[in-house]
Amino acid sequence: MASGGGGGGGMEAVEVRFRLDDGSDIGPSMHDQATTVTALKEFVLARWPQGKEIAPRTVNDVTIINAGQVLENNRTLAESRNLAAESPEGPITMHVVVRRSRPERRVKQPPKARPPERIGCGCTIL
């Protein structure tokens, strides 16, 4: 098995391919159906190709999509599968989206009060 995730439970392993945004793949690789989505993200993160322009730094930067549905971190592979969308032959293709964590936003300071504009003329008569 390529990754664990909490007990075998006698479930059959599943072959999964992770498709990246540029069309390249990680895998296919075998995963236990009890593997959590978080463990799948860790698997992808550990095998991310070097030299890619966009690369995740943490598991939170990775989103996995299967059959058009964003997979939740606490769910297992078995709970996240869509049997109607899967081919009986070959691996399940899951799409990987990288979304960088946004840095914490600084609280905007209210604009400083401007000094009142002078009203009047600055002309000198000779």
Curated annotation (Swiss-Prot):
The modification Cysteine methyl ester is found at residue 123. It is a lipid-anchor. It comes from the Eukaryota. The keyword Lipoprotein applies. It holds the Pfam family Rad60-SLD_2. SUPFAM superfamilies: Ubiquitin-like. Residues 124-126 form a propeptide. Residues 14-79 form the Ubiquitin-like domain. Keywords: Cell membrane, Lipoprotein, Membrane, Methylation, Prenylation. GO terms for cellular component: plasma membrane. A lipid is attached at residue 123 (S-geranylgeranyl cysteine). It is found in: Cell membrane. May serve as docking site to facilitate the association of other proteins to the plasma membrane. This is Membrane-anchored ubiquitin-fold protein 2. It comes from Oryza sativa subsp. japonica (Rice). The gene is MUB2.
